[in-house]
Amino acid sequence: NMAEASYIPLTEEALDDLKEYIKRCVSHAEYRAGDEWERIPIYKVETLVDGRVAIFVLFDHDAPDEITGIRFYHKNGFLWAGGNENLNKVEFEEGILYRYTLKIVQSSGKS
C-alpha cells in the first residue's frame, strides 16, 4: 500500500533555486525562417520583477524579416523548449529583442 503525501509547497528559496537552474541551463536558440533553422546566441536571461524567468534573444539586422519558429536548447544539447512564432522584423527599424517567459506555478499534483 502507498499513501499519497499532503500538499507540501516548496519554499521561496527552493523556487528561486529552480529559477537559477533554468537561467544556467539554456545554452542557445534557433529560429526558423522558411524551411531553415539558424542558430543564434542567448542575449540574456533574468528573473523579472513579477517572478517569471525571461530568456532574451536579439534578432538584429542580419536576421531575416519573417521568423516562423523558435527553439531553445539545454547546455547538454537537447531541445528544451520550442514552437511556432510569427515575427515580422519589417515592423521594427533596427531589430527585435525577443522575450520568452516562464512562470513557475505550484500545485498539489492531485488530479
Regions from the language model: what does each represent?
Residues 1-69, 75-111:
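Small cysteine-rich, disulfide-bonded extracellular modules of the LU/uPAR three-finger superfamily
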